[in-house]
């Protein structure tokens, strides 16, 4: 078993199977592209368990991903994919960077979901880019761009239904996709309160990493409550 990659939140290892990788979730939390960073016991367990439940739910609703199964509290087994260097962001309600960029009021509900692409490049601070930029950078073709948008909107519909069942609002989320050796585009990485903005329906209280970004509560307690809500749906 060889360490293949280590990022801010995860380590990826080879296995004795050519078509399987092991992902280990770390106890680190970051914000502001790593400008703010802490280690919190239990964070890896929570994100792994939440992502495993959500990926299984998405698969049950026709959305394929790299996820195979959960191995332990902090580990999961996944299919190897070549990550497309884009963060695909879907926004249902205005919050975060879009309020500063375009002047929307925080909490303003969009008429329809907005899909944005951000170029995964730490040196450039992950800039927002257009479809034409995506093609110019040879990241994806016209066909792939349409597949990414279509999959992102389908994921949005399924996640909104899931959050609605927990009396929560899906404000926005970011996802990543990868390509298999045969060129199939699969959902990859994770879906957790690290990668979503989630509000309580009644109070608009955060159930996401904004409690850490804005120092408004305990990240571990917030994520545990969210996990409990997910598990209560089983």
Curated annotation (Swiss-Prot):
Catalytic activity, as annotated: 5-amino-1-(5-phospho-D-ribosyl)imidazole-4-carboxylate + L-aspartate + ATP = (2S)-2-[5-amino-1-(5-phospho-beta-D-ribosyl)imidazole-4-carboxamido]succinate + ADP + phosphate + 2 H(+)
Top enzyme category: ligase
Disulfide bond entries: none
UniProt KW keywords: ATP-binding, Ligase, Nucleotide-binding, Purine biosynthesis
Keyword Ligase assigned: yes
Pathway participation: Purine metabolism; IMP biosynthesis via de novo pathway; 5-amino-1-(5-phospho-D-ribosyl)imidazole-4-carboxamide from 5-amino-1-(5-phospho-D-ribosyl)imidazole-4-carboxylate: step 1/2
A Gene Ontology BP annotation from the UniProt entry: cobalamin biosynthetic process
Keyword check for Signal: no
Pfam families registered for this protein in UniProt: SAICAR_synt (PF01259)
EC number assigned by the record: 6.3.2.6
GO MF annotation list: ATP binding; phosphoribosylaminoimidazolesuccinocarboxamide synthase activity
Family that this chain belongs to: Belongs to the SAICAR synthetase family.
Designated name of the protein: Phosphoribosylaminoimidazole-succinocarboxamide synthase
Provenance organism: Staphylococcus aureus (strain NCTC 8325 / PS 47)
Classification of source organism: Bacteria, Bacillati, Bacillota, Bacilli, Bacillales
Originating gene: purC
